[in-house]
Design a protein with these regions (language model features):
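Alpha-helical scaffold domains
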Residues: 1-225
């Protein structure tokens, strides 16, 4: 039977590999196979719930970038929260780039926001930058609507990191939050809750967003220092 790695190489697109390697400066190009995401998603759907997939999910660490992406796609499909969390927590330390991190969106989180919160608190305090980035993205994805609490943006603001992709996710969170809850989020930009870099990047992202109305964009531009 063809191994998963062999299957991934059978889908290799050399042109896409070269292009994608340029988007992933922190990843050794030799670890990038060059599989387009639609093909990887189709493969994940076909592989899911097979004995081969179950074995693959226990085989960490992986060698290739696409193997980690496939791992994320398989985990995401799990509908039971309790079943998902142990293998997810084993996988989070393997996140080593923004793309795999941002791909990982478990479907069962939307129905388990109360159960997820203690994990988010733990991940926000982790010393691994992509675990922290993942936690902030989950707060952005699931807790800006009906499940919002004023405590959540405070938790994101409290994250202290010099890692570029953590700070970018903080800015993305606050720019998105402005579209949902402008009056509640604006004080984070008028005060000193955010680092100057995150503050300026938040304003930039918000001004560029199609979800922010013109009058709010004008107010945000006036806050630039």
């Amino acid at each position: 039977m063809q191994t998963i790695t062999e299957a991934l190489f059978s889908m290799q697109d050399e042109g896409y590999r070269s292009f994608h390697a340029g988007l992933m400066p922190g990843i050794d190009p030799e670890r990038i196979i060059g599989v387009r995401m639609p093909a990887l998603r189709r493969y994940a759907a076909a592989l899911a719930e097979t004995p081969q997939a179950a074995l693959f999910l226990r085989e960490l660490p992986h060698t290739y970038y696409e193997e980690n992406n496939l791992h994320a796609l398989l985990l995401m499909r799990e509908k039971d929260f309790s079943t998902l969390m142990p293998p997810l927590e084993r996988f989070l330390p393997e996140l080593d780039n923004w793309a795999t991190c941002d791909l990982l969106k478990p479907v069962c989180f939307a129905r388990n926001t109360d159960r997820l919160l203690p994990y988010l608190d733990k991940w926000l305090a982790d010393d691994r930058p992509y675990t922290v980035r993942f936690a902030i993205e989950m707060l952005m994805t699931h807790y800006l609507g009906a499940h919002f609490s004023p405590e959540y943006p405070r938790r994101v603001a409290a994250v202290q990191s010099e890692h570029y992709y953590v700070r970018m996710m903080q800015a993305w969170y606050f720019a998105t939050a402005l579209a949902f809850r402008y009056e509640e989020i604006l004080p984070f930009l008028t005060g000193d809750a955010l680092s100057p870099w995150v503050r300026q990047k938040t304003i930039q992202k918000a001004v560029e967003s199609f979800r922010i109305p013109p009058q709010h964009k004008a107010e945000l531009k006036a806050l630039r220092r």
